[in-house]
Amino acid sequence: MAQRKTNGSKLFMMVLYMVAACSAIPISDLLDRASQRSDTLHSLSTTLTQDLDSHFPPMGRVITPRPSMCHTSSLHTPIDKEQALQVSEADLLSLVRSLLQAWRDPLVILSTSANTLPHPAQNSISTKVQELLEHTKSLGDGLDILSGKFGPAAQSISSLPYRGGNDISQDRISRLTNFHFLMSCFRRDSHKIDSFLKVLRCRAAKLQPEMC
Amino acid sequence: MKKVVEVFLLFLLLVFTPHAKGTGNSPPGKPTLNRCRSPEKETFTCWWEPGSDGGLPTTFALYYRKETSETVYECPDYHTAGKNSCFFNKNDTSIWVNYNITVVATNALGSTFSDPVDIDVVYIVKPNPPERVTVIVLEDKSWPFLRVSWEPPHKADTRSGWITLVYQIRVKLEQEKDWETHHAGQQKMFNVFSLRSGGTYLVQVRCKPDHGFWSEWSSTSYVKVPDYFHREKSVWILIMVFSAFIFLILTWLLHMNSHSLKHCILPPVPGPKIKGFDNQLLKNGKSEELFSALVVSDFPPTTSYNYEDLLVEYLEVNVPEEQELMLEENKDLHDGCLKSECSTSDSDSGRGSCDSHTLLMDKCGEAKEEERQTDQERMGTEAEDMVSPDMSSGRVKTWPSVFSPLPQYSSNTLDEQSSLEMAKQHYLSDSQFLPSSTSSYLTQPGHGTKEALGPSYWEFCLSNKQPHLLHPQTQARQQLQAHSDVDISSIGRKQAPAGLQSPLLRPTEYVEVQRVNEEDMVHLQPVVSGCGQNNCSPQMPQGEDYSKVKGVDSDNVLLLQRNMMEEDRCPCEHQETNGVKENCYTSSTVTTTQKPTAMPVQDEMVLGMNGYVDTATMCILPTY
């Protein structure tokens, strides 16, 4: 599965590279492809969160850290539709890329942590986290190539370092809580990515209204 | 003290006041926020469920707090969405932001807070049902189908890509209860095939955002599919007509070929077929024609013959001088189809003609006409059977069955001999074959007798009248004689053909009565003269031959006379009717006639002296 994903991502990159080189493939198709990937990404994260919640002690809710404490919260993203529709395509793409970039390291940490997560569904969680990692990487790589088509503004990426530390706390509850918190942050960010890409897709496919 | 009493009274008052009221007011029960929904990811609404009101008018208030700030806001709109609801308009809605919402129920006695709920608007999207669902019936190569088309809910902004909707439609017949669901993806149009003609269909559509909840089903659209049964019917009519046509053709063909089919399925049972034998004639009872036909085809002629004529009193057996002559004659006889005619005239001077009265008994023949008839019939079929030369017209009355066999001879390799034999056989074998008749006695030499007929025997029915046994024609006569000679000699020649040869060569040979069958037929068999008991090689018919019929005595004994020397007569002589002596067949007198008299035959066997075969009337004629 991992190899398939890497192959898929490689293929995607190749395709995008070719696009960059020859511009034979229309942007709308590429964006369509990208939005499909982001859709998968978000679905995975939703499933993962639900798996975690199934066994997460309700009382843990109280001590759940607030989402505003996500490491990506400093990134200013539109908070409603009007704002989102006013953002230029390059900026939107830049936002997407920044988000994707910001999650590369935390996902690695999550993946590591998932191997020893004290959770009944640890196996499936671990697998899904692995998939998330691959998807994120492939999408990021593809969009890196695609951004060349959108001008210089798309090239800038905001740096959003993760400072959570490699070792998520020792005790079980803390680890679970942190894991859950990170997952919820990722779920939201993946939704943002998906939404932005779909807006971009719709904008690029003026001649194909059925895509929107 | 007073204070205590006052406090006590106050306390009692406080306690009993609620009871005095009877209903019991209490602060309101805890309300619960049961759901919040956003139809287009721009606004959202929350509904709560009030708890018990505690008997007092209760008011509700919703307070919310966004995650980014600590400010608590109250619901801006309690009415738009109905009772116990709070509507957040676009300005108050932020996405990708957690809302912490709490509902408070308040009455006169107090207020109760609900549990707080955290929501993110993007996760609670449930669009409105699709709008303007239209269903029309279109035709695809004369087969109808439904085309369903719709619009997304007007609030959902799919054009900008802000919200992406996927659709689902479901169809069912009016009278059915199960829906048929189809996933339509993002398209706004769908075709439904495989419709039942004349049915009414119900169609509904719903939608869902990419990461949200399904909407409610749209209102039902009814559509009636027109009848296209008549089109189907016409096809069926065509098919019926076509198959009826084919059926008719098949029936006609069958009728045409019924005969051949009958032959195929029920082939006729082959019956015995005799060349030249016409069943119809037989059925008609015209035996003459029947047998004449047989005669024509090389069968011994069986025209009406006089049995009496056939009988000869004695058989005159002559030994031709030259074998060649005999051979020739034989050949002639052999080749030709001799008709059976019994002519009374006996041109044969006595060379064993059929007409010789000494050969056969008249009585024999007469009496045995019936038998002969049957014999004749039998004869054809029983090749190996004894042929009693029985010719009605012929002088020689030999049983029909007498004549058949001389198979040995036929199988003789030597042509001449065989021919000789043939001739003899013919002569012998033809019951119909009139020995007296001139020509064609000898029919088919090989007819039926080619095969190794074990014993060659021939029966004579001796009759008083001894018509010429031999055919009148000289040739025939000679041949007949030859035949008789040969036959005689060959009679009882059960040996290998080799043995036959020599005797065949010999003109004069023994005739030995082999047996008498029940029909009073004398079975003669040739005797190898000169052969001893043990070692008679049949090949050497020593000089004994008799083919001379001496006469028939009163007892209907055919007396044969030996022509030549008798030195080598076979010492072993005894009659064996079935004499299976190795090589030696002795002659024996044969008294024919009946079975009862068969015994006497044997007794009289020794009649003949010197190894003669006294072929007395062996056979048959007992009953005449």
From Swiss-Prot, chain A:
InterPro entries: 4_helix_cytokine-like_core (IPR009079), Somatotropin/Prolactin (IPR001400), Somatotropin_CS (IPR018116). Residues 1-24 form the signal peptide. Keywords: Disulfide bond, Hormone, Secreted, Signal. One of its GO terms (biological process) is positive regulation of cell population proliferation. It comes from Dicentrarchus labrax. GO terms for molecular function: hormone activity. The gene is prl. Belongs to the somatotropin/prolactin family. Disulfide bonds join 70-185, 202-212. GO terms for cellular component: extracellular space. PANTHER family: PROLACTIN, SOMATOTROPIN,PROLACTIN. It holds the Pfam family Hormone_1. This is Prolactin. It comes from the Eukaryota.
